């Protein structure tokens, strides 16, 4: 095809010579990359006569008439946001909870509003260039037939192709629209939805459709040439596999499909731990990776390429889903650990139910307990010996009591300095929270959100944990795990550094016992590692500003969420300790008392409860955590030495504070 003819075709699209040359280069690449034998006689005839306009018409006609792609989300979208589609048409955008309106609706895809409206967050531009709003615009067009969506889409698409380039280097740097993660997300997400739907609109030109295909090919080749790691690599493979499977008309399609299948299969073995958890130890990225894997597998099944994957592939995928099910909190969400927001467990089981062999556990989650059954086991609790999560639960009921205890490594990525952290739920209410660390911005809040100061663990001399590893445990973790009908028990130790200098100040051992189904007893042992005295402090975080201090329990804090359940934080054996503190909304160097949320919960003041020792080489904190229903009588407590007597809900228990792993004896603790 003559270059001059192609340049003439694209000349009406822009008055700038550089843009025309770029668009022409896209078309030239497209014509070279399409396999004529797969495109029909009309297209082949246009090539033989070097009739560029005819080739454009024939190629566009071919792709317009192709059957709908076998994408379940395309046929049955989980729902689309009509209001968001309308805003996007006008250039009104929102990313990472930051709004921006482009004047006159003229979008600059390389503009970052957080440069002028802080805090700085590179994710705004990156996530904006995932173009998820194009999916909303496409579904809005299909639902209404209003061509305003199609016209706006073409305008934005051509602007994006003209205005963004893949950098020769540092394509993953701030300000780039060609990060590999965005390319992967686009190629299975918004770009497929937009292409598959808008190709039916007469207001989207033939040239726009073909330029979009040419850009998709460029992005797929970019991903093939520059693989990254961890969850990024899975999203990259997702994009390559989607493009190569949905558009076999391209000469490279088969090679790209095999490359993607090989990469994702190899990475599954590396990234999925033997207990089914993803090695970044974040439910967010566990969900991302599981979704990528299952979407690739689903597409392979729908396009007749299941044999590209060994049986082990589906087994590993199932293990990731079942890990999420076993870890699910009573509200059928995942407890937030490392960088995270609230992830519904159905994000795993929904796609698993239509992709993997059926399991009653998937039905149980997807139906919200109406059908199916929960995981079977000796008890409802579970320990993940490679991830290091101890999950203690009273049962699988909607209002069950639940605690997640982290005794594991940092995680391969997105880690927080929070070993020995706990999350505590009664039903869907998170009584003691881990907020997930907030947006990926450059701010004091983000620094606080990933630090020990925003987690339910211990400080030494006002310094938080600071460790470099291990990111993944080289062997099974021994947490002394016990799970019996009367109680659960787990323990873990932190003995790495504190503060910016990673000083080896102290060793922190936490022991957690769940007296089913009513309360938790925690023993925190802080031991000096340098033979010096230190001030130790325990932190607990509650998403409320309201609380009381019960007169019957000196030093105790009782939350006031105003709901059906509250949490009583009751210090035991408080000799050698200051009066507990309760702080909200403090800023500056001693920041505490904040919920640093992401997506569903933005930054807001919360409550940090602190228990601080007087200077000592060693100190032991004992804490009783008792969820109490509204109007319920508080427990009766008596402590003699290490023997604790608790009477609550008509039942008396006798426990040994020095040996939480022991069963309760008939005549007291054994």
Segment roles from a protein language model:
Residues 129, 236, 386-388, 418-420, ...:
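Residues that flank catalytic or metal-binding motifs in active/ligand-binding sites
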Residues 100-318, 322:
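Aromatic-lined, polymer-binding surfaces characteristic
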Residues 93, 383-385, 415-417, 451, ...:
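Short solvent-exposed loop/turn micro-motifs enriched in small/polar/acidic residues
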Residues 1-92:
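Extreme N-terminal leader/anchor segments
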Residues 39, 49-56, 65-73, 79-86, ...:
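Short, solvent-exposed loop/edge-beta patches enriched in aromatic
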């Amino acid at each position: 095809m003559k270059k001059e003819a192609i340049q003439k075709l694209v000349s009406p699209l822009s008055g700038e010579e550089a843009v025309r040359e770029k668009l022409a280069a896209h078309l030239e690449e497209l014509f070279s990359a399409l396999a004529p034998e797969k495109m029909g006689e009309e297209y082949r005839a246009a090539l033989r006569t070097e009739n560029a306009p005819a080739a454009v018409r024939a190629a566009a006609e071919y792709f317009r008439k192709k059957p709908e792609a076998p994408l379940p989300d395309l046929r049955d979208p989980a729902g689309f946001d009509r209001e968001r589609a309308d805003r996007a048409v006008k250039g009104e955008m929102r990313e990472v909870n930051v709004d921006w309106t482009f004047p006159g609706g003229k979008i600059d895809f390389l503009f970052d509003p957080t440069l002028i409206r802080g805090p700085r967050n590179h994710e705004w531009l990156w996530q904006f260039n995932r173009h998820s709003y194009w999916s909303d615009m496409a579904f809005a067009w299909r639902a209404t037939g209003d061509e305003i969506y199609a016209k706006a889409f073409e305008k934005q698409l051509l602007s994006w192709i003209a205005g963004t380039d893949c950098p020769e280097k540092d394509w993953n740097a701030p300000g780039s629209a060609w990060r590999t993660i965005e390319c992967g997300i686009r190629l299975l997400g918004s770009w497929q939805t937009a292409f598959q739907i808008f190709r039916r609109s007469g207001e989207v030109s033939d040239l726009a459709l073909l330029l979009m295909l040419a850009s998709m090919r460029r992005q797929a080749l970019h991903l093939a040439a520059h693989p990254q790691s961890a969850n990024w690599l899975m999203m990259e493979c997702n994009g390559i596999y989607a493009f190569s499977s949905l558009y076999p008309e391209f000469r490279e399609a088969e090679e790209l499909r095999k490359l993607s299948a090989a990469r994702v299969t190899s990475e599954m073995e590396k990234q999925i731990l033997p207990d089914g958890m993803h090695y970044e130890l974040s439910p967010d990225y566990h969900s991302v990776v599981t979704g990528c894997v299952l979407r690739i597998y689903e597409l392979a099944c729908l396009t007749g390429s299941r044999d590209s994957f060994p049986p082990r592939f589906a087994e590993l995928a199932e293990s990731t889903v079942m890990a999420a099910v076993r870890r699910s909190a009573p509200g059928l969400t995942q407890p937030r650990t490392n960088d995270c927001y609230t992830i519904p467990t159905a994000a795993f089981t929904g796609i698993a139910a239509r992709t993997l062999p059926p399991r009653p556990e998937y039905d149980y989650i997807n139906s919200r307990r109406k059908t199916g059954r929960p995981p079977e086991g000796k008890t409802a609790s579970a320990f993940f010996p490679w991830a290091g999560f101890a999950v203690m639960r009273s049962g699988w009921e909607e209002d069950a009591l639940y605690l997640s205890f982290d005794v594991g490594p940092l995680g391969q990525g997105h880690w927080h300095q929070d070993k020995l952290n706990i999350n505590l739920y009664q039903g869907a209410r998170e009584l003691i929270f881990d907020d997930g660390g907030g947006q990926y911005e450059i701010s004091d809040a983000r620094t606080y959100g990933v630090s020990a100061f925003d987690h339910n663990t211990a400080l030494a001399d006002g310094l938080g944990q600071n460790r470099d590893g291990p990111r993944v445990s080289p062997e099974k973790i021994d947490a002394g795990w016990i799970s019996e009908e009367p109680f659960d028990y787990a323990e873990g130790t932190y003995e790495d550094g504190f503060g910016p200098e990673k000083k080896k100040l102290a060793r922190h051992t936490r022991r957690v016992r769940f007296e089913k189904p009513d309360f938790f007893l925690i023993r925190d042992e802080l031991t000096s590692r340098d033979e010096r005295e230190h001030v130790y402090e325990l932190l607990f975080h509650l998403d409320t500003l309201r609380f009381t201090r019960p007169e019957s329990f000196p030093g105790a804090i009782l939350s006031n969420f105003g709901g059906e359940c509250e949490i009583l934080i009751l210090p035991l054996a408080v000799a050698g300790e200051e009066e507990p503190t309760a702080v909200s909304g403090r800023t500056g160097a001693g920041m505490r008392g904040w919920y640093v949320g992401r997506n569903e919960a933005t930054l807001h003041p919360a409550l940090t409860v602190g228990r601080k020792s007087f200077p000592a080489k060693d100190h032991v904190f004992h804490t009783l955590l008792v969820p109490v229903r509204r109007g319920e009588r508080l427990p009766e407590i008596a402590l003699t030495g290490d023997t604790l007597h608790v009477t609550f809900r008509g039942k008396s228990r006798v426990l040994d504070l020095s040996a939480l792993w022991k069963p309760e004896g008939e005549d007291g603790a054994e």
